[in-house]
């Protein structure tokens, strides 16, 4: 089953490589990564464009900043997967995540939505 992962981007040059690398390192090949830049003013778009060399990565550069909801909607319009996953550009997925999602879809007889947990990672060591 084909999965589209939509990554909305706005001024996240510090995190974007880790996000996209985590998707490209998945052991699941039947997916596309749709990166939608919401008119970033930092180097985010340039970082995203270097991933276009991968055949399953599509980068869309919006002409006007219009917020997260519109950026996700553009990603939906540009995607072609049977399932859509949103991954914020300052987040990343663990190895095997997409394959686990595919397994859940098959096991649970094609659910309409899947929600899964997350870990919080802090840059500062004084955060509890």
Regions found by a protein language model. Give the residues of each.
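Nucleotide-sugar donor-binding/catalytic module of glycosyltransferases
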Residues: 1-128
């Amino acid at each position: 089953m084909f999965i589209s992962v939509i990554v909305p981007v706005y001024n996240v040059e510090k995190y974007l490589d880790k996000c996209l690398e985590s998707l490209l390192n998945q052991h699941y090949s039947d997916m596309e990564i749709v990166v939608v830049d919401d008119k970033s003013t930092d180097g985010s778009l340039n970082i995203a464009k270097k991933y276009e060399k991968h055949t399953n990565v599509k980068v869309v550069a919006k002409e006007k900043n219009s917020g997260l909801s519109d950026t996700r909607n553009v990603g939906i319009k540009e995607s072609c997967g049977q399932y859509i996953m949103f991954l914020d550009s300052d987040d990343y997925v663990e190895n095997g995540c997409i394959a686990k999602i595919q397994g859940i879809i098959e096991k649970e007889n094609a659910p309409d939505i899947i929600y899964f947990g997350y870990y919080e990672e802090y840059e500062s060591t004084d955060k509890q």
